[in-house]
Design a protein with these regions (language model features):
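N-terminal basic/disordered segments at the start of proteins
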Residues: 18-20
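OB-fold nucleic-acid-binding modules
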Residues: 1-15
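OB-fold single-stranded nucleic acid-binding module
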Residues: 22-33, 43-91
Length: 91
């Protein structure tokens, strides 16, 4: 399983992670997005979900593990994961 420590800025990645917390926020021009803290079991990262429909249409909630597809950008000198897709995991 891929760990956050192995992912570099500029990478396009698919990984499994726990949503530790997630909050809907708004940009200065009132566009909605979600800020989330994701954990791979060893470390946590900051993620942005610019497409609110990814969260709202699939009933994505904190405290659960999902499969994410993301692009890693650099923002303010740190890695920022921009989530492109979220998939629920069947048991």
């Amino acid at each position: 399983m891929i760990k956050f420590v192995d992912i570099k800025i500029g990478d396009d990645v698919t990984f499994y992670a726990l949503i530790e917390n997630m909050q809907k926020r708004f940009t200065p021009n009132k566009s909605g997005y979600y800020g989330a803290t994701l954990s791979d079991g060893d470390s946590s990262i900051d993620a942005r979900i610019w497409d609110c429909n990814l969260v709202e249409s699939k009933d994505i909630t904190a405290g659960n593990v999902y499969r994410f597809t993301a692009h890693v950008n650099e923002y303010a000198g740190k890695a920022q994961y921009v989530i492109k897709n979220i998939e629920t995991i069947s048991e």
